C-alpha cells in the first residue's frame, strides 16, 4: 500500500496559524508526511474572497516556504468556475489510481454542513475525510439520516486511513486556535496587531499590498 496522501482545501483569505498548526499536529498524530494545500478560486459555500487568487496563492507560498510538510496545488485557482471538492477529488483519484490512500481534511464546522456540498455522496468514494475537531460544535449531524451516514463511515483507528484507499471518516483530536480569517481582516481594518495570528512574511506582504483595509 502506498503512503496516505492528504489534501487541505480552503479560501485562505488570508492563511493563518488556525489553518496551519492544527494540520501540523494532525500530521504528527496520524503519520502524514505531505499535505497538499488546494486554495479555492470561487468557493461555492461562502462569500467570495477579498484578496484575489494571485495574492492568496502568494500568501500561501510565503506561509509554507519553511514547512516541508506542505505543498501547493493550483488546479482550483486555474478554474474559472466554482471550486467543488467532489470534482477535485475525482481528478486526484484518476491521477493516482484506485489503490492510493487519499484523505481530505476539513473542520468540524464543515462536517455539519457536508450534506449540502455538491455531490457530497461521491466524496467518500474517492477519499477519506479527516475532521479536525473544534469546540462549540456538536458531534452529531442535524438529521438522523446524515448521522447514520456518519456512523456508517466513522473509524476511531487512524491506521484505517493508511490501509484503505477511501471511505472512512476520522475525527482527529487536534488543537483549536481561536483564529479566523474574518477576525484577522477585522483587526487589520481597525489597525490592530495580528503578529501572533499568522506568519510574519504573510503579514508583511499584506501590509505591502494594502490588503484588508
From Swiss-Prot:
InterPro entries: Cyt_trans-like (IPR004821), NadD/NMNAT (IPR005248), Rossmann-like_a/b/a_fold (IPR014729). It catalyses: nicotinate beta-D-ribonucleotide + ATP + H(+) = deamido-NAD(+) + diphosphate. Keywords: ATP-binding, NAD, Nucleotide-binding, Nucleotidyltransferase, Pyridine nucleotide biosynthesis, Transferase. The keyword Transcription does not apply. Its EC number is 2.7.7.18. CDD domains: NMNAT (cd02165). It holds the Pfam family CTP_transf_like. Belongs to the NadD family. NCBIfam families: cyt_tran_rel, nicotinate (nicotinamide) nucleotide adenylyltransferase, PRK00071.1-1, PRK00071.1-3. Catalyzes the reversible adenylation of nicotinate mononucleotide (NaMN) to nicotinic acid adenine dinucleotide (NaAD). This is Probable nicotinate-nucleotide adenylyltransferase. It comes from Shigella dysenteriae serotype 1 (strain Sd197). The gene is nadD.
Amino acid at each position: 500500500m502506498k503512503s496516505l496522501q492528504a489534501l487541505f482545501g480552503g479560501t485562505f483569505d488570508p492563511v493563518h496559524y488556525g489553518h496551519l498548526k492544527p494540520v501540523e499536529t494532525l500530521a504528527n498524530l496520524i503519520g502524514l508526511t505531505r499535505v497538499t494545500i488546494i486554495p479555492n478560486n470561487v468557493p461555492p459555500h461562502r462569500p467570495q474572497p477579498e484578496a484575489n487568487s494571485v495574492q492568496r496563492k502568494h500568501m500561501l507560498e510565503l506561509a509554507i516556504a519553511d514547512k516541508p510538510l506542505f505543498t501547493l496545488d493550483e488546479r482550483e485557482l486555474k478554474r474559472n468556475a466554482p471550486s467543488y471538492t467532489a470534482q477535485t477529488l475525482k481528478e486526484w483519484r484518476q491521477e493516482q489510481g484506485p489503490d492510493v490512500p487519499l484523505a481530505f481534511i476539513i473542520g468540524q464546522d464543515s462536517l455539519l454542513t457536508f450534506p449540502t456540498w455538491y455531490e457530497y455522496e461521491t466524496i467518500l468514494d474517492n477519499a477519506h475525510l479527516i475532521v479536525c475537531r473544534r469546540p462549540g460544535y456538536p458531534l452529531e449531524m442535524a438529521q438522523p439520516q446524515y448521522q447514520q451516514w456518519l456512523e456508517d463511515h466513522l473509524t476511531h483507528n487512524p491506521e484505517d486511513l493508511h490501509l484503505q484507499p477511501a471511505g472512512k471518516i476520522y475525527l482527529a483530536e487536534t488543537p483549536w486556535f481561536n483564529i479566523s480569517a474574518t477576525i484577522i481582516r477585522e483587526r487589520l481594518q481597525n489597525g490592530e496587531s495580528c503578529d501572533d495570528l499568522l506568519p510574519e512574511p504573510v503579514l508583511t506582504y499584506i501590509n505591502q499590498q494594502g490588503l484588508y483595509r
